[in-house]
Amino acid sequence: MKKTLVALAILTAAGSANAGINLYDADGVKTDLSGAAEVQYRQTFKEDSDAELRMDDGDLAVNTTVAISDSLNAVAAVAFEFEDGKVTNDELWVGVAGDFGTLTAGRQYMLADDAGVGKDYELGGDGIDFVQANGDQVVKYVFDNGQFYGGVGALITETNPDNNADEASVYEGRLGARFGDFDVRAYLYSGEDVNTDNFDVFGDDKVNVDIDGYQIEAEYIVNAFAFAASFGQVDYELASDSSQKIEADTAALAGSYTMNKTTFAVGYTYWSPEAKGTVKKMEEANVFYANVTQQLHSNVKVYGEIGSSDTDNSEFGYVAGMEVTF
């Protein structure tokens, strides 16, 4: 009962905190609650599509850290995602953390989920896509000493949605370094029997593909300006027939300027797929976008974005949205 009362008191007092709400902090145990809600009015690039009010994002997470000793902590998290009218438990993991880094295991997002330098909200086009970026059987290790950082991860096995005999497996790595305001990093990714419906050019709605790729990224911040660039290559090979594949090059440029609580950003994304075998040819894409974000509060922002793609049968896109976090 005492813990409950303390949690309620802190919940009330910390309602405006932008890094989550501290529910409990005593006896070496710290527990935080965080969440986000985001709604947009969006017109996509798709030709003849109608603008729609879209529930873009809803998240709720509880994270805890327990001090086992002066140099070792136990960590855990449970998180839920609200999307398409459904509630999904997208994170449930445990681990240990210390000066050596953090080692976690369970249902969680992989390092590949962080890849990308775009400053867009919705209209940035197709950038790097490693397809499988989370799973139930993920083991991940990350390390960061301030200047150098890195990590390795593995999706040990993941039964495909169709419950067939093939199970996906993924191995990945990230290595980066910071030199003052300059940050450079690289991602490596290799997956087998990854189930996806992203590529109808293979002839089926859903197929299993083997994926191998990399992404190199760089970011530089000078005063109120931020610049970013990336280049990556990914091969998508049909698991049942290695002669059928897509080799894709992707690149991105982005920049932003922040003035008080307003941020202006522009960006460009390039996507160039090359089909091999009898795979249907895919279209090259050049996408440009611009947006402005107004930070009304440390927990509240509103934004507007416009974008244009040179692909066939595409039209001008726009987005207006609002996000509230706690």
Swiss-Prot record:
Range of residues in the leader sequence: 1-19
Function recorded in the entry: Forms pores that allow passive diffusion of small molecules across the outer membrane.
Subunit structure: Oligomer.
Species this protein is from: Photobacterium profundum (strain SS9)
Cell compartments where the protein resides: Cell outer membrane
SUPFAM superfamilies registered for this protein in UniProt: Porins
Domain of life: Bacteria
Family the entry assigns: Belongs to the Gram-negative porin family.
Keyword annotations from UniProtKB, A to Z: Cell outer membrane, Ion transport, Membrane, Porin, Signal, Transmembrane, Transmembrane beta strand, Transport
GO cellular component: cell outer membrane; pore complex
Membrane topology category: Multi-pass membrane protein
Presence of keyword Transmembrane: yes
Protein known as: Porin-like protein H
Induction: In response to elevated hydrostatic pressure.
Chief place of localization: membrane
Biological process terms in GO annotation: monoatomic ion transport
MF term (GO), any: porin activity
